[in-house]
Amino acid sequence: MLALGIEGTAHTLGIGIVSEDKVLANVFDTLTTEKGGIHPKEAAEHHARLMKPLLRKALSEAGVSLDDIDVIAFSQGPGLGPALRVVATAARALAVKYRKPIVGVNHCIAHVEITKMFGVKDPVGLYVSGGNTQVLALEGGRYRVFGETLDIGIGNAIDVFARELGLGFPGGPKVEKLAEKGEKYIELPYAVKGMDLSFSGLLTEAIRKYRSGKYRVEDLAYSFQETAFAALVEVTERAVAHTEKDEVVLVGGVAANNRLREMLRIMTEDRGIKFFVPPYDLCRDNGAMIAYTGLRMYKAGISFRLEETIVKQKFRTDEVEIVW
């Protein structure tokens, strides 16, 4: 069976085609701006403009036609309303024109589900991106969020800090490179509340210290990363202890950061459990994870009526009953 998935919750439009155990195509295009950030209207226009070219590219790479596709999947939320609506409209049009079943997929769940293509069974997932920071795991037939940011996503915090430093967007790789040259830890606010996190205080203080001119920028970047990532690892370890699961996966755009990977690897090795990070193109926002999750849902007997495909900007992970 083959599934086609369309992802477009934020600034990346991705289209993926997968079989039950293989990614046949995974193409994307990301809207970038000089100042960073995402304007919902601009994201929607970007997705609408590139939908047809990316669809053609995905079909060409996979060597299939739309007639060969068994199910159409799309990111139903959470995300930016205008961008989500472009994606849903395209998915509906394909489903109707080619008479295919359609499935709406929760974006956050898809980030964790794609790891199961690689043999992961039942993990605790640390999902870190621009807009989302969550620790989630399957419990009682649903993905439960055991901890999350109470204010801004870690990726957003890093990007704002990078913009303050004049590094441009996206800031993650540039902050990471600076941090590698850091020699001294500068104390910054560390906010963990149970299994929830807060990054706004850390960001504000890091910017204040930078503007004071008293600190090396490399040391600030190093300290920012160490503080934020230590908090992420702490709440992940608490979720592991609570759920007694023996696998941890790291997903989302910030999963590209080597220091975060290293800190999680140390924690999981200390606990004697498995740690997995998918290839980066399957960590970032992508259509393949939507296609794969949609295919698993469809095989379990799930398909949507068109009136059920309305987008959900605040689509919680625990709204979805996991029956696959």
Swiss-Prot record:
GO biological process: tRNA threonylcarbamoyladenosine modification
E.C. designation(s): 2.3.1.234
Disulfide bonds: none
Origin: domain of life: Archaea
PROSITE patterns referenced in this protein's UniProt entry, alphabetically: GLYCOPROTEASE
Cofactor: Fe(2+)
Residues the record lists as binding substrate: 127-131, 159, 172, 176, 257
Catalytic reaction annotation: L-threonylcarbamoyladenylate + adenosine(37) in tRNA = N(6)-L-threonylcarbamoyladenosine(37) in tRNA + AMP + H(+)
Root EC class: transferase
Cellular compartment(s): Cytoplasm
Cellular compartments per GO CC: cytoplasm; EKC/KEOPS complex
Keywords: Acyltransferase, Cytoplasm, Iron, Metal-binding, Transferase, tRNA processing
GO molecular function per UniProt: iron ion binding; N(6)-L-threonylcarbamoyladenine synthase activity; single-stranded RNA binding; tRNA binding
Positions with a binding annotation for Fe cation: 107, 111, 127, 285
Cofactor binding comment, as recorded: Binds 1 Fe(2+) ion per subunit.
Subunit text: Monomer. Component of the KEOPS complex that consists of Kae1, Bud32, Cgi121 and Pcc1; the whole complex dimerizes.
Family the UniProt entry places it in: Belongs to the KAE1 / TsaD family.
Function comment: Required for the formation of a threonylcarbamoyl group on adenosine at position 37 (t(6)A37) in tRNAs that read codons beginning with adenine. Is a component of the KEOPS complex that is probably involved in the transfer of the threonylcarbamoyl moiety of threonylcarbamoyl-AMP (TC-AMP) to the N6 group of A37. Kae1 likely plays a direct catalytic role in this reaction, but requires other protein(s) of the complex to fulfill this activity. In vitro, binds tRNA, ssRNA, both single- and double-stranded DNA, and exhibits a low ATPase activity.
Note: The ATP binding pocket identified in the crystal structure would actually engage the substrate TC-AMP.
Protein name in the entry: tRNA N6-adenosine threonylcarbamoyltransferase
Organism: Pyrococcus abyssi (strain GE5 / Orsay)
